[in-house]
Amino acid sequence: MLDETAAMALLAAARDAARAAYAPYSGFAVGAAILTADGTTVTGCNIENASYPLTMCAERVAVGTALAAGHRAIQAIAVATPAAPGGTPCGACRQVLNEFLPRDGTILVVLEGSRGPEQVPLASLLPRSFGPADLNRARDGESGGRQDSSRQ
């Protein structure tokens, strides 16, 4: 867990990022701030598009920005939705974040709680996730306890 000061600072960075959001269609600004494993903070905002499926979520913009700067491990991400505090990453963003788990296997998601920052492990938002380890098991011929129903 992040200490209270670090969680509040990360959430403040996410709120600042939300101010840069391009949301002319929904008016729903979202900001995200990533804390990388080396302590760097990287932000992103949502970028809407008239072709709605091409909209980029703040979390994925922040991940892309972090990757472009050479960061690969994410310690925490704060998400700010000023119009409706307490918003969480969508399913697609949860899956993308899961791709960049640090060695300890935990990414903290910092949300705007009613009494201050609320820290939630990504695993609780994405139970039974699919990630790189699943592909490694498949490549190595391990089932990982899952049965292929087509072979029964």
Language model features: what each stretch is:
Residues M1-A23, H71-Q152:
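C-terminal binding/interaction regions
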Residues A13, A58-A66:
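Short, well-ordered amphipathic alpha-helical segments that serve as non-catalytic structural scaffolds
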Residues C57, V61, A92-Q95:
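Short amphipathic alpha-helical face segments that pack within enzyme cores
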Residues T36-D38, G113-S114:
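Short acidic-glycine loop/turn motifs at beta-strand connectors
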Residues L35, T65-H71:
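Alpha-helix C-terminal capping segments
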Residues G27-T36:
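Short beta-strand scaffold segments in enzyme catalytic cores
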Residues N46-R60:
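Compact, glycine-rich, soluble single-domain proteins
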